[in-house]
Amino acid sequence: MKAIIVLLMVVTSNADRICTGITSSNSPHVVKTATQGEVNVTGVIPLTTTPTKSHFANLKGTKTRGKLCPNCLNCTDLDVALARPMCIGTIPSAKASILHEVRPVTSGCFPIMHDRTKIRQLPNLLRGYENIRLSTHNVINAERAPGGPYRLGTSGSCPNVTSRSGFFATMAWAVPRDNKTATNPLTVEVPYICTKGEDQITVWGFHSDSKTQMKKLYGDSNPQKFTSSANGVTTHYVSQIGGFPNQTEDGGLPQSGRIVVDYMVQKPGKTGTIVYQRGVLLPQKVWCASGRSKVIKGSLPLIGEADCLHEKYGGLNKSKPYYTGEHAKAIGNCPIWVKTPLKLANGTKYRPPAKLLKER
């Protein structure tokens, strides 16, 4: 393969004799120069390498995050992001994060209609922050929210440490206690409660079911309307009544209904609003997140350390300044991608052996 010359050294002599020339043999090194085209030289130093695929690793000198919550056993990153019971734990701070769930599976609490919202992006949104923590307090009093009083619904698929049924800590399933009637759109303000100037990620949603179940739970079997607004972003939804698609990825959860889950990002001091009818999942604990973590697609487990993390090759140690092969996103102390190999000429321009001449 042709290479581009980086440096070419030329040696001259001011001797008063014509000698036999440069002692050399056939040179296998051909470099391509800007002024002389292809040139044979007596020696080169390769500047490029072609990596092979390897395990992903921890980035040297930097905290690297794989799973959002390494100590939350049998929990997907979506479980952690929604704060499913038994999946609440400390998320370690990190300057680099591995996006290892290309299509995050649903949580085991309740069948989620993923395609209606951007909820699959929530774990990746959190992964992009260096510091992430779940608030200790609820953002609103769900039981006394407009349209209440409410009892908080639970799911037998969500047992917690104290009960055989529960629900996500980020949301409250608002089921009317007594006033099971249709309602006009109601509005609740969502205050900013993070304390360190972080972004506040507020999770909310709504539940829908068959006409029979909607009438039983909420007193209204018609489609319900919902709107969220924060940081200049407004989102509208209308609930679907029955006719839900089969979601085999839910692992055979028994519920007949579905929930739609979304989130909004609130900047420091900014209030959000949710306009809702029956079946709302009101926000409770919120995520407080700050700093930036570089995110790269990869896989787990993380084995050892590496200078560079590359989406196609995994963990790389930088042995040369350039590399050839597949070009993809990389983070860390990485070699630079080039299309063709580069070589540094560390010898002279090759000349064939000169014939022996007489002295003058």
UniProtKB/Swiss-Prot annotation:
GO terms for cellular component: host cell plasma membrane; membrane; viral envelope; virion membrane. InterPro entries: Capsid_hemagglutn, Hemagglutn_HA1_a/b_dom_sf, Hemagglutn_influenz_A/B. It is a single-pass type I membrane protein. Its main location: virion. GO terms for biological process: fusion of virus membrane with host endosome membrane; fusion of virus membrane with host plasma membrane; symbiont entry into host cell; virion attachment to host cell. Pfam families: Hemagglutinin. It is found in: Virion membrane; Host apical cell membrane. Keywords: Disulfide bond, Fusion of virus membrane with host endosomal membrane, Fusion of virus membrane with host membrane, Glycoprotein, Hemagglutinin, Host cell membrane, Host membrane, Host-virus interaction, Lipoprotein, Membrane, Palmitate, Signal, Transmembrane, Viral attachment to host cell, Viral envelope protein, Viral penetration into host cytoplasm, Virion, Virus entry into host cell. Glycans are attached at residues 40, 74, 160, 179, 246, 317, 346. GO terms for molecular function: host cell surface receptor binding. The keyword Cell division does not apply. Belongs to the influenza viruses hemagglutinin family. Binds to sialic acid-containing receptors on the cell surface, bringing about the attachment of the virus particle to the cell. Plays a major role in the determination of host range restriction and virulence. Class I viral fusion protein. Responsible for penetration of the virus into the cell cytoplasm by mediating the fusion of the membrane of the endocytosed virus particle with the endosomal membrane. Low pH in endosomes induce an irreversible conformational change in HA2, releasing the fusion hydrophobic peptide. Several trimers are required to form a competent fusion pore. Homotrimer of disulfide-linked HA1-HA2. This is Hemagglutinin.
